């Protein structure tokens, strides 16, 4: 399965713990080492120290719509995009709806292994 990773410098405003991009990449690499069925195609990263940074996030979304990969891996939902509305729109309503899966390591979500209702409930709980 072709997958990509996404990391960013700053989490959502309401999240207190801090993960560096290096720490996010380490967690993703460890997961990939255990899951040989996943083939990392590309790493997207918004490195600007700006809450609104989203150039890589937007490029990942566009590439996903074009089906350049099958799955996105992130260390934490709080580092999955610039804010919850953007993530919900891009991941849940756009990419997931077209068959792109999402693996969120910290929260233990793998949309390959759960029902659509469980995904809906997960995003609802993050609101």
Indicate residue ranges for each PLM-predicted region:
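Short, structured surface patches at the beginning of a domain
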Residues: 1-127
């Amino acid at each position: 399965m072709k997958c990509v990773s996404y990391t960013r410098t700053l989490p959502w405003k309401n999240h207190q713990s801090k993960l560096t991009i290096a720490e996010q990449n380490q967690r993703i690499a460890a997961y990939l080492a255990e899951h040989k069925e996943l083939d990392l195609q590309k790493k997207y990263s918004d490195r600007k120290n700006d809450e609104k940074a989203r150039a890589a996030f937007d490029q990942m979304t566009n590439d996903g719509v074009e089906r350049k990969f099958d799955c996105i891996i992130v260390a934490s939902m709080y580092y999955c995009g610039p804010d919850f509305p953007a993530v919900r729109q891009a991941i849940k309503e756009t990419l997931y709806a077209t068959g792109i899966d999402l693996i969120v390591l910290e929260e233990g979500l793998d949309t390959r292994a759960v029902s659509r209702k469980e995904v809906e409930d997960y995003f609802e709980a993050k609101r």
